[in-house]
Amino acid sequence: MQGSVTEFLKPRLVDIEQISSTHAKVTLEPLERGFGHTLGNALRRILLSSMPGCAVIEVEIEGVLHEYSTKEGVQEDILEILLNLKGLAVRVAEGKDEVFITLNKSGSGPVVAGDITHDGDVEIANPEHVICHLTDDNAEIAMRIKVERGRGYVPASARIHNEEDERPIGRLLVDATYSPVDKIAYAVEAARVEQRTDLDKLVIDMETNGTLEPEEAIRRAATILAEQLDAFVDLRDVRVPEEKEEKPEFDPILLRPVDDLELTVRSANCLKAEAIHYIGDLVQRTEVELLKTPNLGKKSLTEIKDVLASRGLSLGMRLENWPPASIAED
């Protein structure tokens, strides 16, 4: 029975109709009125654009220097071969982000994905997928293919700009379509629960490349959506702490030697005799203290005061925590 008017019905997975190994229809009901389109559109966009998967991103074909060429004994030109490689459905074991697979074939006939040589960490989901055709018994083709894990769609031009090193001649880049979902559509039909007839039924029609089960695809898409909405569940004003620039403990001028003041020889020698080596040492002295220094008269005192004033300093200043550790260690 229906509870409070504020309670929402929770959908359940009603049926998975497996039309083929790569095509399925998934039905969820009941949904509150309007939620069929709300959830259907959100899941559709995530399934098309945000599902992680593996794709061919680079290939090296023996005897081929660039993509605008042909290869003797091969029916297709190189651009056609690259387009066919984009349709390769590859599943790579978790924990590996990139792998290399090889293809070596000779003799007349089609070259298919099942001819690819790989280790146990790689599975080809469409082994009958045609890559090219060899036209005579003496024809042969050899290629090294790089497969990478990623998300969404990344054109080859984007990777060209990101490459730090110059790309070797003969390494051909392929537009990468990582998503294992080829086609996705949804329909909203009427549903009924007891006396309520204004509910929605969501039917998702999905085709994949065979590397991901439809039920798992929806589960992953729903998880991505839920994670993105988590921020709205506990809506708070989360302030990012401002990065404060670390200010030096002392004005850098105080750490400079007294010699930088370019005093007369008489004044400089008097200060050194009193172990006043840094400007920070000097500004903490008072006029009375300096006048007690042997051989330092009023003329030298006036000189020191004028030089300090030109730098915005004066005698009798108080400096907390002086001297700093860097000077104390010296």
From Swiss-Prot:
Q: Which reaction does it catalyse?
A: RNA(n) + a ribonucleoside 5'-triphosphate = RNA(n+1) + diphosphate
Q: Main EC class of this protein?
A: transferase
Q: Where is this region: Alpha N-terminal domain (alpha-NTD)?
A: 1-236
- Name assigned to this protein: DNA-directed RNA polymerase subunit alpha
Which gene produces this protein? rpoA
Q: What HAMAP family does the database record attribute to this sequence?
A: RNApol_bact_RpoA
E.C. no: 2.7.7.6
Any one cellular component term from GO for this entry? cytoplasm
One GO BP on record is: DNA-templated transcription
